[in-house]
């Protein structure tokens, strides 16, 4: 839910700045609108308000105050908080609003918020965000018949669907654990070979070395 709320706030800030910051009511309407959303939701004011508070706790949103403001309005601080560039924000926004997408889809849909020079720039931006610690996005396995693999955001505890986690880059601890297991396995094989060689020498009447 936080992803939909934050994505909506980012979208409205960039595409309709005259209507920004947003009241809870306008934010509910933005979250539940039919276009540029997948899936379409029916969030309530209470649900959206709760999500906004959780985002405030993380420093991603803040209460806007002004002389002409009678109803509380909220603004997002996501890019500022994480030190993101315009292209990164646009891609993450689309991923939060529509879910996993291919680079070509992202380039076309993010055009209203940021213009990418070409598809290669989109892919490079996604790759850079996937290499952060922790990663902000992850590339999913390419589906059968698909032109390209999809990318998914990893914000708010985002999880890779079952069977797709293998595409996540292994952590240092995972790599060290795998290396230790391989060393142990090789040591066991060497010990077995030494035992077999010792037994063969005994059969041949040779004195085995200690």
Model-derived regions, located:
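Positively charged, polyanion-binding regions of nucleic-acid-associated proteins
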Residues: 1-21, 83-100, 126, 131-132
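Amphipathic alpha-helical oligomerization/assembly segments
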Residues: 82, 172-208
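Intrinsically disordered, low-complexity serine/threonine- and proline-rich regulatory segments
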Residues: 1-7, 14-18, 52-83
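Short, amphipathic alpha-helical interaction segments positioned at domain boundaries
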Residues: 66-105, 149-178
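A short, conserved structural fragment
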Residues: 49-66, 126-143
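Short acidic, hydrophobic short linear motifs in intrinsically disordered regions
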Residues: 16-40, 100-116
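Helical coiled-coil/dimerization "stalks"
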Residues: 109-112, 140-155, 195-210
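Extended, charged alpha-helical interaction scaffolds
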Residues: 78, 84-123, 133-137, 142-143
């Amino acid at each position: 839910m936080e992803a939909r709320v934050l994505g909506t706030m980012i979208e409205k800030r960039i595409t309709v700045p005259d209507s920004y910051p947003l009241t809870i009511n306008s934010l509910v309407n933005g979250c539940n609108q039919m276009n540029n959303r997948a899936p379409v939701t029916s969030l309530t004011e209470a649900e959206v308000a709760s999500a906004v508070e959780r985002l405030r706790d993380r420093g991603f949103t803040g209460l806007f105050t002004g002389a002409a403001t009678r109803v509380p309005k909220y603004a997002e601080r996501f890019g500022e908080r994480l030190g993101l560039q315009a292209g990164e924000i646009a891609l993450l926004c689309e991923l939060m609003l529509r879910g996993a997408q291919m680079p070509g889809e992202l380039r076309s849909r993010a055009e209203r918020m940021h213009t990418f020079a070409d598809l290669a720039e989109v892919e490079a931006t996604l790759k850079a965000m996937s290499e952060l610690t922790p990663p902000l996005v992850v590339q999913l396995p390419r589906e059968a018949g698909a032109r390209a693999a999809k990318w998914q955001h990893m914000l708010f505890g985002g999880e890779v669907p079952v069977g797709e986690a293998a595409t996540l880059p292994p952590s240092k601890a995972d790599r060290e654990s795998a290396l230790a297991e391989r060393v142990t396995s090789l040591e066991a094989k060497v010990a077995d070979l030494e035992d077999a060689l010792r037994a063969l020498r005994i059969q041949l009447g040779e004195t085995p070395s200690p």
